Every structure is written in structure tokens, then in C-alpha cells.
Amino acid sequence: MNNVKSGGRPVAIVAERYVVEKEIGRGSFAVVYKGHLADSSAGNVAIKAVSRSKLRNKKLLENLEIEIAILKKIKHPHIVGLLECERTGTDFYLMMEYCALGDLTFFIKKRRSLMDKHPLVRTLFEKYPPPSEHHNGLNRVLVVNYLQQLSSALKFLRSKNLVHRDIKPQNLLLSTPLVDYNDPAEFHARGFVGIYNLPILKIADFGFARFLPNTSLAETLCGSPLYMAPEILNYQKYNAKADLWSVGTVLYEMCCGKPPFKASNHLELFQKIKKANDVIQFPKHAALESAMVDLICGLLTFEPAKRMGFTEFFSNGLVNEDLSPYEVESEPDLETKSKNVAESNMFISEYLPTAERNKRASPIRLGDSCTLRGPCESPQGADPYPQDNTQSDQHEHLHADYSFQVEMGQDGQQADGEEKRKLYNNQEERSNEERQFGQVSNGRNQEDQLLLHQGRGQIPCEQNRQALQSHSHVAAKQIPDKDSKSSVSCQKHAASAPTKNDHRTTRLKEKTKCSYSDLLLEKEYVVVEKKSVEVNALADEFAQAGSGAPAIRLPDQHHNDASQALQMARHSSTSVSAANTAKQTLLRRNSRTLSSSGASTSRRPSLVDRRLSITSLGATNALSKALGMASLRLFGNSHQQSSNGSSTFKQNPNVTSLLSPQTFQDMTENAVLSADHQWDNSRQADVLHDDSIMKALENLTAKVYAIYSFAEVKFSQIIPLPPSSTQDPYTHKRMSNGSCAIDDEEDDIEHSPGAETYRKNSSGANANTGNYNFSLDTIHEMNLNDLPPNDLYILCTEAIVLYMKSLSLLAYAMHLTSKWWHESADKICPLKLNLLVQWIRERFNECLEKAEFLRMKTQSIQLHNGNQLSASTMVSEPVFVEKLIYDRALDISKTAAKMEMQGEYLEGCEVAYSTSLWMLEALLDDVSDEDNYNDDNLGHTGVLDKSDKEVIKRYIDSIANRLKALRRKLSR
């Protein structure tokens, strides 16, 4: 892309012939601009710019390459065409057909506003008025017209053995009619179907498409949940019929103005679809003909085998209905307005009033520099920080990247503080960099798309970027306090002066919450959430299955607020530290029960909550004490224990003691010391037997525990726990450099810049109750004082790759468990296996959250301390997780050897040797391609060659021999 000057201002030129104009659409990985040919302002195009920096793993890059390859091969009048593609060192540019009327959602959800402002849309809906003012459904003529155009494109795709996998209104674009033709004959001669003077539907966004013959099955989770076939939602293999389900949902929405099924999460959506039992409910105001109802019901059939097939669909009466009678009468007004729209060179959203365009959520995440720097000027009068004035009864067309606030419309009433805190915390939890490419629609206006997506937003021009950066720190940190104060203020007002509007406000809040859930689900992509949901769903199934004994009861989902955990800590009658008490409470609550019951579940606790769960090893016997002491001395972390070396937990009557941290601790200790080292991936075919699956899980659990513990050390250095108020004979101070502090009894932390911050923040702690006043803001400030930005950035990077390695092993463990479970005839599992599965679920969710939190922290460091980060840090050698684990394993084994030679802490030496062995063996595990991760320099896998593995095997043999000799010594 080149920058030249035209008329005194810079102009961006792509492929030496396309001029870049305003931004008209935005997604997670791409920005769409309006453009035109350099030698003619009449040749409009849509320029899709994809930054290579956003495609941070192989899957995302593959999706883009697939989209380019498919669009190059297919040419159809009802599919958005690819005109040209250019690759540069930093970006991909796709020059595509320009669709000035946006996408189908504009006609459905913005119809009323557009009728007032858009001349072509007003004329169109005057001729084909909506069937009812009570819903947003379209006139039957428009519905059938677009149904036929959609079916024409699908028929072409099937002839090429292609399945789109993401058909939804946002990917159905509308182009201006009567632009380069004048009559029906010419219209149909060009291959178009339908009515010649209506906007023309075109399928867009092939980021998820793939070649899939009729006889083939796929199992990749793709698409948008509200329009996703149930077999995909349930992680079953699927075929091209999945597209027909999506067609059914689009057809239903065109008729009724809303999707057929709504839910707050994917599993609940699946349960609702299944519970409907193929009985589709239609709004009472939507008077549909029987043929339309039959077609929708045939497409929305739960079982793919019973669902209408392509042959039946393509031969349906509505799909083949003769629409020529609607073309008999000439419509000069439509033709004139179409040409005026084309000549005006305005995108559909530019016709909306500023207030309507700004009726969107306010961004609170900060973006990086714009992908494309050109003449992208903010529209005159547009607010660069649009506040959310969204009416709660209207489902706005938003990209649900969890980066917006919900406020209460024109009444000025804000959503309650708790709900807004959940929205804010959700930003910390979502993993956008794992989202698949393709969530871009041309049908979004420029102001709407000033949303700054979580951690990776893009701003269309340099001046906006600088302005937002100047407000970044304040915006990010003021939101929680602002929410709390607003909530308190509203509550006081309600208590002192109740009004007759209270009930209406309550209903408005409830509707806003529903709309929020709808928005999240409507646009959410779940390719990378597949494993997360699978892990939790399988663990739920195990927890409910039992094993002759009572089933493991799941955590109470109605009380997962961190404040309750702290309250419990404050009023505990036992002399247990606040951290231990909070750990017991949160551990019971943090199992994300995305249950198959269909009930809406609460959010995962935020990192502010979950930070409390990183506490001591609750030792109750000599072996546990040795493990706790050894981990403190060998790993050098700051975990605390109670004064007598044991922990007392206040048991929640709603949860059995089987889910207590002590049970998990004893189980993992046993796995580290006694799991079968002989099991490896080559024996995965044996997992159909109960004893084999147990050996496999114990083996993987031990490896995960060793690497996870190392990751926890890194995490505790980034966000340290407040010091325990109870003196512990095994307490060992953390070294700021992360080294093992075994031979060095003096600690530099007491004299570090962060030490005073520790003392200030722990001064309010009560020695008996463990009452800590510890906020996220304080932690952030303490961290920046404790470690320089360079060290903190490297530390975060190392912790991320360790958590990711743990995640890959945990996912593999659940894959083996799922295989055993679904091929088991009796569906009865041993209690120990059940506990292992619950532990794996706990660690998976925790590692996922912390890895995402750390990723955002690295971005925050770059944003706030970019000029302080040395160039060597930003361009240094990538962090290899294999080298981290290898070096740590050797350090642990060498330190244990010194202790053994001195005759000290022999039980701890046994744990150390075992831990070192598991870490080295984990390096030899083969990870499938889809589990590899490569996020810039965040974790490079698959780097060990044959000679490296031979070296590791020699160390494994050597350490194993020392461990055998030590155990013989201990048995005497």
C-alpha cells in the first residue's frame, strides 16, 4: 500500500489502482473500507484489510487462505466476488464487490430508521410494506425473493462440494439494484434470480467455508451459535445439511424479525432446540402461510437424517415460485432512486442520523494502531467516544467482543452495579486471539465500528488512535469505581424516594439483560471455545454420574461472588488464613457448570476472585508436609500454610468433601509420586479398559501438576499474594528473580521497592480473621513497582507458555477420557477417576483464565510502558516452553541431589526427583497440530529434534536411577 497526496491530503493506494476511503465494517481480525478505482471514482469496491499481526496462529492464517482460494475459484451473481488480492509484509488486502446496502440485518433491525432517511429503502418498503408493526419481519415478497437468491447461491456451492458453515443475516449482503442493467431480461441473462428491481442478496465471508462432499462428515466447531445446527452445537460430526439449518434460521428471522431460538450459552441453546422436539413456535403476530411454515419446520429439524435435504429444498414450491408478476409493472421511482444511491457513493449507515449511529455500546478497551492509515476521517460531528444509549427493546447489530457497557437508555438509569461488574470482568475472561477469522460484514457503519475490541481494537485514523491512547489508562481504571458509585447512588435514590416508574425501570433492566445475552450469543464465534466447553460438559456428566456412591454434587451457581468468599474468611471461627478459606470457597464454586440441564449459568469468577485460590498446600500428613516444604524451597514461591502445618476448612453443606482442595491435593501428590511412568501416547488405544484410562490420567495429571506448579511460581511473581498474617515454620520468601532460594536464607524482597507496598496493603489484615483489603488497582501498581516493565513482560510471557503447555496436556487427558466414556457400555466410572476428571476441569479453567489475563497484561505493558521497554525485549529470541521446562527440571534435580548428599529433607528430595522426571517426560509427549500455539513469540512448540530428545531421555534415565536409590534409602 502506498500513500500519495491528492488535493492536499494523503490518499492510501492499494495494489496501485484502488483508493481507500471510509471504514464501513469491522470484525475481530479485519477492517472493511469503501474504496474506488484510482482512475475513476465510479468503480466502487470494498477493501478488506487483514493485519498479519492479528493472525497469530496457523488456523487463522489457514482460514484466510481458504477464503481467498475459494473466492478465486467461484464466480456467481449471488456470491460476493473477489476482484483482486494483494499480500504485503504486514497485511492482506482483498478487493471485493461493493454492497452499498449493507447486510440483511439492516433491513430487519434498522428498517424504521432507514425508512425515514434512505430514499431507496423508503420506496421499497412503501411498495412492499411489513406484514405487522409488532415485529420486524419482512414482506412475503421480499422473503421469497431473498430465499430464492440464497438457494441459488447454495445450489452453486453444493455443485462445488462447498459448505459455507456460517450462513447468517450478517453474512448476507445487499447490493444496489438497477446499477448496470435496466430491465428484467438483462437481469436474468446475467444469472440473477428473483425480482430485478429489488436489492440483490449476495453471500459473503467464506472464512469458515470448506470443501465437503455429500458423503463427508466434519467435526470442527464453526459459525455463530444462534444460527448453528444442533449437531455442531453438540460437537457431533456433521455434513452439508448444517447449512440448511442455518438457512432455516435466516428464513425464520426474515419472517418473524428474530431468531427461532435464543439462549445465554451454547449448551443451553442446544437444550432448547432439543427440548422443542421439532415444534417451532411462531409469534402470534406473524401470520405465515402453511407452505412457509412447513419449509421452516422442515429445515429446522433436529435430527440431520430427518431434516429436509438439498434435493427437497431446491425443489420446494417457494424456492421455485414464479416472481415474474412482480416485474410486470415498471417502477421508475425505484430505478431513479437506485441510481441516485449509486451515484451518491454513500454506504447505508451514512444515511442514519448521528444519534442513531451512536446508539451503540461505549468502548472501554484500548486499541492498537490502525491497520490501514489513509484518508479515514471521522464523520463530522461524530463523537469519538460514543456513549451507549441503546434502547433495551431493540437488538442492536453489534459485534459481541465483550468490550461494551450496558446503560439504561434515555431514562438515564444505569444497569445495576453487579451486572456491570460482570460485563467488565467478562472482558478479562474471553480469549479473543483464539477467535476464528471471518467475523466481518460490510453492513456496519463507520461510527458503530469505533468499538475497540478487546485488546486488539483497530482505530480508523491516526488522530483517533492518539486521542484514545491519551485516555486509555483513565478509562480502563475508572469503570469499576464508576459502576459501584452509580449503583449505590441509584439504590439510595430508590430507597428514599420511590416513584411510579420503579416497576418500569425494573422491567427495562431485565429486558436489557436479556438483550445483552442475545447480543453476546448472536455474534459470538466458538471455534476455540470448543475444548473449553467440551471439558466442562464432560466433567459435569461425570459429576452427575456417580459410582454407586452419591454423585459428586456440583457447586452452587448462585453464590460465586468473591465478596462472599472474603466475608466467609472474615467471620471464620478457625485460625485459618484468609487465602486458605477463600480457596476452599472458590474451589467449590469455580467448576463452570455449563450443564446440560439448560439452565443459564453464572460467569466464571474473574481473576480478582480466582487470585485468592493460589494458596498453600493443605498438608495433613508427613508426606504432605514434605511436599509443601519442598515446593516452597525448590520452587521458591510465596504460598503459605497455617502454623501447625495443617489446614482446617469450613465445609459447605451443599458440596461433599470429595471436592475439597485436600482431596485434590492428596490425589495429585499420589500421582506425582506413584503414577505409571511407563504409560505414553502410543498406548492410547488401550484406554477402553478402566485400569488403562486410570493409568493414563494419573500419568498426564502428574505432568500437568509439575508444569502447572512452575507456572504458578511465575504467576505469583507477577501478582503476589498478600503475606500471611500467621507465622508458618515452612514459610519461604519469594526471590524476585524466580530462582530457587534454597542455599540463600536472606531475601532481597524486604529491601525491594515493592516491600513497602506489601506492608501498606497488609497493615489492615487482622491476624485472626485474615481480613485483606486488596484491590486489582493496588496489585497493578504494586507489580509495576516490584518489577521493571522489561522483567514483567518476560515473566508474563513465560507464564503464558507454561499455562498453554498445561492446557494442551489437560485437553488431551479429557480427549482420552471422552473416548473411554462414550465407548463404555455401562457408563459407570470409579470414584477416583471421577475425582481426576474434576481436578482436570478445575485446572483447565484456571489455566485458561490466567493465560488470557496474562496475555492482556502483556498488551497493557506494551501500551503503558512502550517507551520503557527496551528494544532487546521486544525483538529478543522467542520464548521456548521446552527450554523453560528443561532448565527448570534440571535445576530441581540438581538442587535435590545437593540436599540428598547433605542428608536433608529426603522426603522432599523424592518429590523433587519425581517432579523433575514428570517435567522432562512431558517434553517428549507429542502434541497434535491443533494444540500447537504460536502467538508471535509466545510459545513455540515442536522445536525438539531427535538429538534433543535423546539428551532428555538420558537425563530421565539418570534421574530415575537416583530416585530408585533414594527410595531404597527411605525404605530402610
Curated annotation (Swiss-Prot):
Subcellular location(s) of the protein: Cytoplasm; Preautophagosomal structure membrane
The family annotation for this protein states: Belongs to the protein kinase superfamily. Ser/Thr protein kinase family. APG1/unc-51/ULK1 subfamily.
Sequence positions that bind ATP: I24, G25, R26, G27, S28, F29, A30, V31, V32, K48
The catalysed reaction is: L-seryl-[protein] + ATP = O-phospho-L-seryl-[protein] + ADP + H(+); L-threonyl-[protein] + ATP = O-phospho-L-threonyl-[protein] + ADP + H(+)
Q: How does it sit in the membrane?
A: Peripheral membrane protein
Q: Which GO terms describe its molecular function?
A: ATP binding; protein serine kinase activity; protein serine/threonine kinase activity
What is the first-listed, main subcellular location in coarse terms?
A: cytoplasm
Which UniProt keyword terms apply here?
Answer: ATP-binding, Autophagy, Cytoplasm, Kinase, Membrane, Nucleotide-binding, Protein transport, Serine/threonine-protein kinase, Transferase, Transport
Role description? Serine/threonine protein kinase involved in the cytoplasm to vacuole transport (Cvt) and found to be essential in autophagy, where it is required for the formation of autophagosomes. Involved in the clearance of protein aggregates which cannot be efficiently cleared by the proteasome. Required for selective autophagic degradation of the nucleus (nucleophagy) as well as for mitophagy which contributes to regulate mitochondrial quantity and quality by eliminating the mitochondria to a basal level to fulfill cellular energy requirements and preventing excess ROS production.
Provide the organism lineage as a comma list: Eukaryota, Fungi, Dikarya, Ascomycota, Saccharomycotina
Q: What is the official name of this protein in its record? A: Serine/threonine-protein kinase ATG1
